[in-house]
Each structure stands twice: as structure tokens, then as C-alpha cells.
Swiss-Prot record:
Role of this protein: Key enzyme in folate metabolism. Catalyzes an essential reaction for de novo glycine and purine synthesis, and for DNA precursor synthesis.
DHFR domain mapped to chain residues: 7-162
Family: Belongs to the dihydrofolate reductase family.
The protein's name in its UniProt record: Dihydrofolate reductase type A13
This protein's pathway: Cofactor biosynthesis; tetrahydrofolate biosynthesis; 5,6,7,8-tetrahydrofolate from 7,8-dihydrofolate: step 1/1
PANTHER family: DIHYDROFOLATE REDUCTASE
Subunit structure: Homodimer.
EC number in record: 1.5.1.3
Enzyme class: oxidoreductase
Gene Ontology MF term list: dihydrofolate reductase activity; NADP binding
């Protein structure tokens, strides 16, 4: 993957305890929060792990879905399948120069060192779970915007950008 040619963004929602998933499920349902994801990723390249793809069961509509899997010969109908993040870049050529990483925990951890930015919804509650979002190093990322959304479940949506130097 050539970081100069492709801009990589992580898109995630996590609980106050960094939980992003419990088995194949997202442990919350927040009206409006999924709209942020759709707005950011529509008509873009979206990378997800195999387990996330299997929990959804189909490609994301109006997106070029790439599934990252270590399983040789893995097939995901309607999606590109790659074994490493470095193989994702060629699949972005006809879909623009932005790539959005959208679950799971291992994929986030692999992509974070290459990320230009992070779109993160932080839910103001703790949840049971077995998948966690990696810690963002304040020396590497800075908050460029943040908005708290009050509702049945309160969350803060923040945009982080990689610091230069």
C-alpha cells in the first residue's frame, strides 16, 4: 500500500470501554449513528474483515466492498477479497483514492499505522464485548472536530487527523 496515493480513514463506533463488538453483533442501536457511516462511505471503497462480512452476509450497497481474509481461497460474492492491506490499493484505482476501514478489531489495528484520519463515534456507555477499538495516540492524532449528540443513547462523533511530523 502506498500511503502517498491512497488516503486511509478508519470509521468506527465504540463504547466508553472501547468495545466495538460482541461476537458478530454491534452491542447498541443508535438512531442516526449509522447515517454517519453511510454518508462517509457511499460510493467509496470500504474494507472490512472476514468475520464482519460474514455477520453482514452481503456487500454493502453503493460501495466497493473489500474483504480482508487470511483464509486461502476465501470467496465473498460481490466483493474483492485480499489477504493483506497492501493488496487493497489496486482495487481502489477505479473507485477513487480514499479507503474506509469499517471493522473489525484486527483490521483496525492493521490499518491504524497507515491511517490519515479517524471518524469515531464514542458512545457514552460501557458494553459487554469481545472486540475493541485500538487506542489513538495523541502524539499521532488530533481532534479536528467533535459533536455530542443527545438522544436515547448519547454519543460524541469526533474526527481525528494524523499530525504532521
Amino acid at each position: 500500500m502506498n500511503p502517498e496515493s491512497v488516503r486511509i480513514y478508519l470509521v468506527a463506533a465504540m463504547g466508553a470501554n472501547r468495545v466495538i463488538g460482541n461476537g458478530p453483533d454491534i452491542p447498541w442501536k443508535i438512531p442516526g449513528e449509522q447515517k454517519i457511516f453511510r454518508r462517509l462511505t457511499e460510493s467509496k471503497v470500504v474494507v472490512m474483515g472476514r468475520k464482519t462480512f460474514e455477520s453482514i452476509g452481503k456487500p454493502l450497497p453503493n460501495r466497493h466492498t473489500v474483504v480482508l481474509s487470511r483464509q486461502a481461497g476465501y470467496s465473498a460474492p460481490g466483493c474483492a477479497v485480499v489477504s493483506t492491506l497492501s493488496h487493497v490499493s489496486p482495487s481502489t484505482a477505479e473507485h477513487g483514492k480514499e479507503l474506509y476501514v469499517a471493522r473489525g478489531a484486527e483490521v483496525y489495528a492493521l490499518a491504524l499505522p497507515h491511517a490519515n484520519g479517524v471518524f469515531l463515534s464514542e458512545v457514552h456507555q460501557t458494553f459487554e464485548g469481545d472486540a475493541f477499538f485500538p487506542v489513538l495516540n495523541a502524539a499521532e492524532f488530533e481532534v479536528v472536530s467533535s459533536e455530542t449528540i443527545q438522544g436515547t443513547i448519547t454519543y460524541t462523533h469526533s474526527v481525528y487527523a494524523r499530525r504532521n511530523g
